[in-house]
Amino acid sequence: MFFLSTGVFGCMSLAASCFERDGRRQHDIARLWARSALWFAGAPFTVIGRENLLPVAVYTSNHTSFMDTPLVFSSLPFQFRILAKQSLWKWPFIGWHLNRSGQIPVDEDGSAGLNRAIRALKAGMPLFIFPEGGRTKDGQMQTFMRGPAYIAIRARIPLVPMALIGTFELLPIHTHHFRPRPVKLVIGRPIDPSGYSIRQADELTARLRDEILDLYTRHAGPGDLIPSLATAPEEQLLESTEDQ
């Protein structure tokens, strides 16, 4: 049923893309798909920290599972753009949806995608990015890339750290079988990048990483794996060899 609903909502989204240019209807359809995905997976969700939401920001979170994306779409009450590795645009159906809904690809160089992301922010469109670039294989927090910090500094737009809790236990990367359980998204306080220069992107990345780990640790419940922290930002801006 999960894969059937994904196909149905995907077809609806592609059809909607023929009648709009801003992707708003497609985003609404994606949100319906996301909530149905969590329901089929047996994963009631909770959102903590809604008071920290901003109209325009660079939203970021840890990345532990394929179910992270449904949780983010179900939890954020507004349209946003996703930055993801360009290789996803080569996938049949998924790539078509990403392209038609206005999501932003980032290649190995990263500059074109990052510049497009900055323009989207300045036009009033929030962004969402997984700073780890790909899903964790063991539940541990991976090294963060500096792309989100770079974008926030360039655009002078706040970073909002978020922790996704329970999705790794719900559907780890090495299985296709759901393990029904509650999940939650915790939204942290915005980080103002105005005191940082581009040369301090690594410093801001480290702060972002610390904030997400702190949110996760403080709100994790029984049975939730507590991740450790990688030591340094990646040289790459966003690209990763791991699957989203």
Regions found by a protein language model. Name each.
Residues 66-116, 121:
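Membrane-embedded segments
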Residues 43, 103, 156-157:
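Short glycine/serine/threonine/alanine-rich loop segments
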Residues 40-42, 77, 95-98, 154, ...:
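Short, well-ordered coil/turn elements that cap or connect secondary structure elements
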Residues 61, 83-85, 107-108, 131, ...:
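Thr-Gly-centered strand-to-loop micro-motif
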Residues 1-46, 93-100:
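A transmembrane-helix-recognition feature enriched in membrane-embedded lipid enzymes
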Residues 30-80, 84:
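Conserved H-X4-D acyltransferase segment
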Residues 111-244:
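Non-catalytic C-terminal accessory region of glycerolipid acyltransferases
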